[in-house]
Amino acid sequence: MLAELLPGHYSNANQAYFDTRRGLPEQARHGLLDVVITPLEDSSEPGREFSWREKGAESRLVLTTSGDDPVGIRAAFETRKDGGWRTDPTRVLRILRSAGGFTGTGPGGLRLQVSARELWLDPGNGDPYWLERSREFHCYADIPGVGGGRDDCAHAHQGVGA
């Protein structure tokens, strides 16, 4: 279930915008943060390893379960080091199922919460980033005179006087 919820593009554009609009001091504002999570295609364990892109840097998020913890999921962030992937001990979480999603806790107050619509990230300072899941959509604009459409709009008001 967690493996189905995680993939997507998340952004805190609303949070960053309203922090500025409310006039919060610079040090209290949440900067714009975009996170893209995708399943790793070359994973030896599909549904267990993900690419996590944040601020132009890529990490791997590896999910594992253990018989020692029948209800928790271990989520470890790995960073590239010395030509390979190494677990960052400051970014290892224990994730549990909660109402409508999953909640993870880690060292130093690190917290992560994911649901169908959002991702909350707290680096440990108690002031989390609220990232909303982006929705993909297509927009087809009808521009008069372009693409073979009729150009009626340009002539609709000819001869109309006030």
Label for each model-derived stretch:
Residues 3-9, 13-23, 32, 47-162:
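Calycin-type beta-barrel ligand-binding domains and close structural analogs
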Residues 27-41:
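Short secondary-structure subsegments characteristic of cysteine-rich extracellular domains
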